[in-house]
Amino acid sequence: LLQRLCATDVAVPPGTVRYAPMLDRHGGIACDLTVARLSPTDYYLVSGTAMATHDIDHIARHIRPTESVSVVDITSGYGVLGLMGPQSRTLLQRLAESDLGRDVFPFGTMQDVMIAGAPVRVLRISLVGELGYELHVPTEYLLTVFDALHDVGIEHDLMNAGYRAIDSL
């Protein structure tokens, strides 16, 4: 289903992350997604802000009767923190229980990592043209991870920037 709907190849090895827009019948962008392959049969889809319902509906409308597909909306269970910039790996590594080095965690991949004692799905992607990560954190751990990032980030000149700040770049 996703291979048919996405404008990029998502038949990739588990752990791979792809920017994967879905097109409408006129060739315009219907959905703007990031797709991470978790296993041979499972994917993790990330919609743009406030677009989950729209994107799930688009996917559901294209499931063929012969396709056995389940789509589960887990939006309310996670918060996303973007950590971008040349010091992002150094900062994140101080809190992670796994090696985040370039050779073991290259661009366009994802790992499930313990960060500040919390289970975090980390996507090694960036929307700002710099080294960066998206941290997908269960909501019950979000404040813990945010505070830990800021505690370590003081020495790296970490600053908060709202999601819309990306549009100014």
What positions do the PLM features span?
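Basic, glycine/lysine-rich polyanion-binding surfaces/domains
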Residues: 1-169
